[in-house]
């Protein structure tokens, strides 16, 4: 009988945070909205709060960056560690150290699905349909996958069954698709700046932005709009048709997450050939099943918010069963290792975090070390050939551990 590798148990889980409401703004990291002044990501982008004039100019004005970065580290009995980052800050630390720890410590490093189900079941009474608790669970789940990969000496994508393509090709999200084209990306996604409270004038302004970028980028470069939950179905439908002459590839997250009937109506009324996409702020497997049933073209879960890699794999299966694409929202290496194994993810998103989109800055800078960025719009699978997720934690980021157990 052949010997089977003996896997260690998990000795301890620890949680830190950095940035957030108690820190100077601009920490970046897992909370990538937390950027300094004069950054495109905080420049009059339409949001659900834009209808209030006091909060329309800046997303930070209503507190988009108050949570900060959560760092979860799991240590095995043999001393090896895995870690991950997400957006949950100090409150996420409390959930990990005071509640979730009991489901993690003492388990085998391979017991990821068991731990995941126990975390979901135990928090159901206060987690609702996602949000902060799901961000925290996602971070733990990713840290467990990182540890498992390091213990067995394999990259996470090989733990999932291996790559189905040699490289990942990317589109860029940011304010300058024209610069993204020069960098080799296949497309550029811009934020909208106006919403229903601006009336038809807002539609004309955002459509003019698309027209300007179409002229700069040429006919074959993808252009998309990210509406960040800021619209209603009538406004979104009118905006989609206003942008149709400029070959807009898709219109994204026009509506709040739970407005499934409105998503179904938007898909039904959108211009022929224009895709409707959403999912970034959906936080449970069940919500993605319902979203899939609306008939949208692409589901866009964030692996750091939807329940982690364990849930992302299940979401991809739901999408595949309906002939839909799954293209995760940003998330750097945590997405890379997943999507290179998905047959229904022909491309992925790279979020431009440099202030003016003119340089290639890693998404989670400075919290991750050795975080890869696309070269000519692509990342080859060989770049991912390191144990776990292949990145290291930058412990010089003023990490604070407010709780212990």
Curated annotation (Swiss-Prot):
**What's an example Gene Ontology biological process for this entry?**
carbohydrate catabolic process
Q: Where is this site: Increases basicity of active site His?
A: 302
Q: Which CDD domains match?
A: MR_like_2
Marked site, Transition state stabilizer, at: 349
The record lists substrate as bound by: 33, 59, 349
Q: Which residues cross the membrane?
A: none
What does it catalyze?
Answer: L-rhamnonate = 2-dehydro-3-deoxy-L-rhamnonate + H2O
Entry keyword set = Lyase, Magnesium, Metal-binding
Q: Which PROSITE patterns match?
A: MR_MLE_1 (PS00908)
Uppermost EC category: lyase
Recorded hits in SUPFAM superfamilies, A to Z, give:
Enolase C-terminal domain-like, Enolase N-terminal domain-like
EC number(s) on record?
4.2.1.90
Where do the annotations place Mg(2+) binding?
Answer: 226, 252, 280
Describe the family membership recorded for this protein in Swiss-Prot or TrEMBL.
Answer: Belongs to the mandelate racemase/muconate lactonizing enzyme family. RhamD subfamily.
Q: How does it assemble?
A: Homooctamer; tetramer of dimers.
Tell me the HAMAP family matching this sequence: Rhamnon_dehydrat
Add the further remark from the entry: Reaction proceeds via a syn dehydration.
Q: What does this protein do?
A: Catalyzes the dehydration of L-rhamnonate to 2-keto-3-deoxy-L-rhamnonate (KDR).
Q: What is this protein called?
A: L-rhamnonate dehydratase
Species of origin? Escherichia coli (strain ATCC 8739 / DSM 1576 / NBRC 3972 / NCIMB 8545 / WDCM 00012 / Crooks)
């Amino acid at each position: 009988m052949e010997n089977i590798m003996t896997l260690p148990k998990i000795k301890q889980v620890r949680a830190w945070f950095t940035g957030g409401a108690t820190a100077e703004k601009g920490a970046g990291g897992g909370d990538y909205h937390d950027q300094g002044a004069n950054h495109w990501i905080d420049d009059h982008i339409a949001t659900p709060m834009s209808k209030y004039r006091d909060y329309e100019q800046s997303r930070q004005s209503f507190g988009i960056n108050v949570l900060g970065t959560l760092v979860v580290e799991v240590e095995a009995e043999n001393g090896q560690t895995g870690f991950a980052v997400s957006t949950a800050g100090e409150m996420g630390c409390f959930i990990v150290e005071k509640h979730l720890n009991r489901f993690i410590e003492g388990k085998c490093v391979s017991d990821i699905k068991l731990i995941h189900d126990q975390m979901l079941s135990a928090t159901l009474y206060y987690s609702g349909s996602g949000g902060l608790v799901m961000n925290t669970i996602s971070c733990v789940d990713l840290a467990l996958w990182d540890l498992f990969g390091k213990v067995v000496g394999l990259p996470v994508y090989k733990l999932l069954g291996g790559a189905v393509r040699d490289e990942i090709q990317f589109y860029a999200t940011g304010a300058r698709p024209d610069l993204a084209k020069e960098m080799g990306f296949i497309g550029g996604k811009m934020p909208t700046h106006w919403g229903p409270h601006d009336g038809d004038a807002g539609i004309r302004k955002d459509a003019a932005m698309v027209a300007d970028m179409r002229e700069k980028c040429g006919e074959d470069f993808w252009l998309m709009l990210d509406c960040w939950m800021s619209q209603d179905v009538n406004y979104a439908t009118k905006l989609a048709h206003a942008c149709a002459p400029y070959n807009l590839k898709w219109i994204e997250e026009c509506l709040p997450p739970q407005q499934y009937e409105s998503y179904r109506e938007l898909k039904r009324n959108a211009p022929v050939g224009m895709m409707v996409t959403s999912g970034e702020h959906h936080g449970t497997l069940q919500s993605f099943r319902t979203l899939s049933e609306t008939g949208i073209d692409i589901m866009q879960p964030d692996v750091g918010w939807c329940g982690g890699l364990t849930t992302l794999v299940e979401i991809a299966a739901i999408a595949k069963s309906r002939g839909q694409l799954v293209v995760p929202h940003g998330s750097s290496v945590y997405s890379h290792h997943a999507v290179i194994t998905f047959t229904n993810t022909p491309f992925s998103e790279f979020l431009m975090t440099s202030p003016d989109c003119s340089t290639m800055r890693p998404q989670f800078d400075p919290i991750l070390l050795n975080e890869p960025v696309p070269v000519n719009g692509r990342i080859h699978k060989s770049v991912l050939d390191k144990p776990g997720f292949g990145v290291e934690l930058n412990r010089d980021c003023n990490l604070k551990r407010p709780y212990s157990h």
